[in-house]
Amino acid sequence: MMRKWQLVFHIDQVNTWALVLGNVHNFLADIAAEDEAVIAVVANGSAVTVWRDGQAEIRRSIQDATHSGTVFYFCRNALRGNDIKEESLPDYVQTVSAGITKIVDLQEQGYAYIKP
């Protein structure tokens, strides 16, 4: 019987992007043949600076993850706090008014919370 997983990964430090993206990749690889997954990544704090700090490889990995259906939400409060204009983000990244509110909303919908 196919199982449908719902996960929300929370990232708030720019230096943990590789870990979070690795976790997403490993999870999807582990369940690929048997189950379905809906994955959200919510970025707040310094994690949003990935778009400003010349981390092209991580940004490519984020874009690649969207091809498997992973959705990325960036916190507008964190963007403002880090002087990053929302318009500078690529189309495959969504913004939310507050990252913490999005996390709570997803948990209310049954998503499992993961903070690597």
Region locations from a protein language model:
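Short, conserved secondary-structure transition motifs
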Residues: 43-51
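Solvent-exposed loop/turn segments at secondary-structure junctions
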Residues: 14-15, 47-48, 78-81
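Short, glycine-rich nucleotide/cofactor-binding loops
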Residues: 9-21, 50-51
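Short internal beta-strands
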Residues: 39-44, 72-76
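Short helix-capping segments at alpha-helix termini
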Residues: 31-35, 65-66
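Histidine-anchored nucleotide/phosphate-binding helix
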Residues: 18-33
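A cross-taxonomic marker for long C-terminal extensions/tails that follow the last structured domain
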Residues: 52-116
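Short glycine-rich or small-residue beta-strand-to-loop segments that form or flank ligand, phosphate
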Residues: 6-12, 42-44
